[in-house]
Amino acid sequence: MAEAKTHWLGAALSLIPLIFLISGAEAASFQRNQLLQKEPDLRLENVQKFPSPEMIRALEYIENLRQQAHKEESSPDYNPYQGVSVPLQQKENGDESHLPERDSLSEEDWMRIILEALRQAENEPQSAPKENKPYALNSEKNFPMDMSDDYETQQWPERKLKHMQFPPMYEENSRDNPFKRTNEIVEEQYTPQSLATLESVFQELGKLTGPNNQKRERMDEEQKLYTDDEDDIYKANNIAYEDVVGGEDWNPVEEKIESQTQEEVRDSKENIEKNEQINDEMKRSGQLGIQEEDLRKESKDQLSDDVSKVIAYLKRLVNAAGSGRLQNGQNGERATRLFEKPLDSQSIYQLIEISRNLQIPPEDLIEMLKTGEKPNGSVEPERELDLPVDLDDISEADLDHPDLFQNRMLSKSGYPKTPGRAGTEALPDGLSVEDILNLLGMESAANQKTSYFPNPYNQEKVLPRLPYGAGRSRSNQLPKAAWIPHVENRQMAYENLNDKDQELGEYLARMLVKYPEIINSNQVKRVPGQGSSEDDLQEEEQIEQAIKEHLNQGSSQETDKLAPVSKRFPVGPPKNDDTPNRQYWDEDLLMKVLEYLNQEKAEKGREHIAKRAMENM
């Protein structure tokens, strides 16, 4: 009887709140119908506000109420909301023995429960935003004034009232207390049973995924073994087929197609590389052609520069000779010979070569020298000029013998101004500076005249060098006479001519030192002697005869035309009666020197082209 009383008491207590809920639901539905009639747009909004999860929660809540109503074991101070978690745990464990029968409830009870669920579903969307507002941690309203250190002891009465209205399972995901830590909330949500279920789920997932990976690895290994076996079989078949057929491969169609495609790709790559190499070679050849054209242009420009230098040099000689005639008066012939003395046989040979290369007659060339004109650039020479392109590059003997010319000073053209006496030590046997000076038609250093004035008449006109002391003032010096500038200008002209001769002599000396094989020591015969000023006419006739004999070997016309030239530009005086033989030997020596210069020029050109090609590569 006691059990029956407690059962009916629990049912009565559960029906009392249902009655209140039904009355409130009827009132709310009446108001809602009025609102829907007034505002038809609100109907669509309310239709969308019925989510299916809320209905599921309502049904679960109904089932929990039914289980609480039919629960046999209950305490005297029974709270209907304290036993909500017990049926849930029983449901998770799968214990269906304690579930009561569903037929025990009447139809009226079911209708009341459904109406209550509908009322809760209507009121929850409106009250949810008010109730589930997050706590603002910075606001002072949420914090109590007398807050203790242990924030767990703080009680929240408002939240208790709300929990009395709704079971705690509805607010599992919401944060009730803002002062609780996250890990504490998680510990409250996850029970040991839920953790055990999760662990079992993960274990099952591991079991499901593990065999798949193992199966895949096994399949890959089997496939590799299968391919290796197939390769071995193909190799054995190839060997057997080669023995039978005679060298042909036995491959399946797919392998043949793959090999053909690979060969085609390789051939295409090789063709592309060959085409690129051909294009690169064409570009390089084009660059080399451009370089050769540049070298030709440079050689032509250098040729014109050399010709202009020779013409300017000869013009200077002619002007110096003319000025000497005007100043000397009665001694005009000796003055012309004096000015024309630096012109040696090599300059005459250079004039002949220039006339041949430029295809200009000697007479016209002499007239151009007189007037100072240059030949037209349209006339192309048949072969290159015998003069080297760059004398500084050819004179490499200085690099091997740095002490050869110590006291020299380079001029604008690159020739040294003063001859060095240290070169006599580097000369080969049978060759000396005296031989080179004799070859150039000049006198040796021992037999050289003291001054350019052979007679006392010219020496008297030379300004005596007055001593200048540190103690004397410049006002006590003698004033210059009116004729002093003429003498100074004439002396400057002499010095310029002497510098040119010295430069040419040193250049030939370097060439002879570099190529000593052109000299035969058995043919050199030094005969010391000194020409006197009284035998100048006889010396000129002998030189003229020697030049005529040399030029008769080439052509008779040029000798007739150059005879007055040789008279006008005589060479240095001979030393003895063996002048013709010595002159022939000098001419042969000059020809050899010029040949070697041409060879060296060609070698230099080839080296220059090779260097440019290597730089471009």
Curated annotation (Swiss-Prot):
PTM per Swiss-Prot/TrEMBL: O-glycosylated.
Region (O-glycosylated at one site): 182-200
Stretch list, region Disordered: 120-143, 257-302, 552-583
Xref: InterPro entries: Chromogranin_CS, Granin, ScgII
Modified residues (Phosphoserine): S174, S268, S432, S532, S555, S556
Listed Pfam families: Granin
Propeptide feature ranges: 28-30
Signal sequence, start to end: 1-27
Keyword vocabulary terms for this entry: Calcium, Cleavage on pair of basic residues, Glycoprotein, Phosphoprotein, Secreted, Signal, Sulfation
Purpose of the protein: Neuroendocrine protein of the granin family that regulates the biogenesis of secretory granules.
Residue stretches of biased makeup (Basic and acidic residues): 257-284, 293-302
Gene encoding the protein: SCG2
Similarity comment: family membership: Belongs to the chromogranin/secretogranin protein family.
Protein name: Secretogranin-2
GO terms assigned for molecular function: chemoattractant activity; cytokine activity
Subunit structure comment from the entry: Interacts with Secretogranin III/SCG3.
Chain positions found as Sulfotyrosine: Y151
PANTHER family: SECRETOGRANIN II (PTHR15119), SECRETOGRANIN-2 (PTHR15119:SF0)
Record's subcellular location: Secreted
